[in-house]
């Protein structure tokens, strides 16, 4: 069953969109509809707000989220009150969001729901841990790739990336940018000693010397353009807890004292550098590592932009597959092996395979 069987190998999955309207919610519904809930306990939540009928920016139609009977979910108090399903209340946490506390419940009937869960990475981790503690075997996170998001989808073991014409209607640009993001997702973990030392640190710029001692660079911000690296002759690892941007990466690349210094960020969502600067850094011998990462198992595409421009799906999928060496699926196709339930089917949500069967 395509990438569904791959998902079942992990205890958590995040589904993230390269940009709004790239088919993230369609991908989420596709996964939720096909998971074997009769033999797997599943919970779902969202980093942002998902399940709205209209995009608040483009004012275009959005697919709603449909939960099946027996699935667990975490959402804010505000959106829990707006649910259109019968549910059993499991927990009301101390985790506060702008829309109230996070409510965890079990769907007793299938139906539509708005999701807005934990708003920070630490809160998301706690919720996931609580779910696993009560016997949930797979946690699904509706994720976000945004500098404004305090919660990272990279806390999950596995990931699906949704891309599409909403990002760019130029196919080559879309393929190149998607391939770049895939490269970032695949950045390896740093060594175990660094993980233990750096994981608790959530702010600032730090370095580890050749004796394993940790030092804070209190005079440096990763977002500042006016700073100098001083007293770092023995730097072995340079850690940026916040956002990594072009200016900072360029200064690291041009500093001869940091030639052998491994650059570490929390995860790929903290990297906001251009492909050009990233490749220059690697070409100069630079090494980037992360503290947490997810296994990217598939990429989905939405070839139609909110403005109505449609790219050729077969060509786009072929070019992406060649560029990233991963399965690429167009879930918007009319020909699929399985269709979504009629109860929430507003558009045909489908999948391209080498062999296809007609939807009924």
Name each model feature, range by range:
Residues 2-47:
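Walker A (P-loop) phosphate-binding motif
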Residues 12-19, 106-117:
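Short, basic, glycine/proline-bearing loop/turn elements
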Residues 31-106, 316-317:
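N-terminal phosphate/diphosphate-binding loop that engages ATP/GTP or pyrophosphate donors
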Residues 43-47, 116-117, 138-143, 161, ...:
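General beta-strand structural signal in soluble alpha/beta enzymes
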Residues 46-47, 262-269, 327-337:
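A generic structural motif
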Residues 120, 124-138, 143-323, 341:
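Conserved catalytic-core segment of NTP-binding enzymes
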Residues 342, 351-353:
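Charged/polar low-complexity intrinsically disordered segments
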């Amino acid at each position: 069953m395509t990438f569904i069987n791959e998902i079942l190998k992990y205890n958590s999955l995040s589904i993230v969109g390269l940009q709004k309207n790239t088919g993230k919610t369609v991908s989420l519904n596709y996964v939720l509809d096909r998971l074997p809930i009769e033999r797997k306990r599943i919970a779902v939540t969202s980093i942002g707000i998902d399940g709205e009928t209209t995009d608040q920016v483009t004012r275009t139609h959005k697919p709603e989220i449909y939960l099946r009977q027996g699935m667990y979910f975490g959402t804010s108090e505000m959106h829990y009150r707006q649910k259109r399903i019968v549910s059993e209340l499991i927990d009301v946490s101390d985790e506060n969001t702008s829309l109230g506390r996070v409510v965890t419940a079990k769907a007793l009937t299938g139906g539509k729901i708005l999701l807005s869960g934990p708003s920070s990475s630490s809160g998301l981790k706690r919720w996931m841990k609580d779910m696993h503690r009560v016997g949930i075997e797979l946690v699904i996170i509706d994720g976000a790739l945004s500098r404004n998001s305090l919660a990272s989808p990279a806390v999950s073991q596995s990931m699906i990336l949704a891309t599409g014409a909403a990002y760019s209607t130029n196919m080559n640009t879309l393929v190149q940018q998607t391939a770049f993001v895939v490269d970032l997702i695949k950045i390896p973990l740093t060594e175990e000693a660094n993980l233990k030392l750096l994981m608790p640190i959530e702010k600032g710029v730090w370095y580890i010397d050749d004796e394993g001692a940790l030092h804070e660079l209190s005079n440096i911000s990763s977002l500042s353009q006016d700073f100098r690296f001083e007293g770092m002759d023995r730097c072995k690892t340079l850690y940026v807890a916040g956002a990594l941007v072009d200016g900072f990466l360029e200064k690291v690349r041009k500093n001869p004292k940091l030639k052998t210094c491994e650059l570490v960020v929390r995860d790929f969502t903290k990297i906001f550098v251009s492909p050009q600067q990233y490749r220059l850094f690697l070409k100069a011998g630079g090494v980037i590592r992360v503290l947490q990462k997810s296994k990217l198992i598939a990429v989905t595409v939405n070839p139609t932009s909110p403005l109505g421009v449609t790219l050729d799906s077969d060509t786009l999928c072929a070019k992406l597959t060649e560029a990233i060496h991963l399965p690429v699926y167009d879930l918007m196709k009319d020909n699929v092996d399985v269709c979504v339930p009629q109860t929430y089917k507003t558009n045909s949500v489908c999948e391209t395979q080498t062999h296809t069967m007609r939807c009924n």
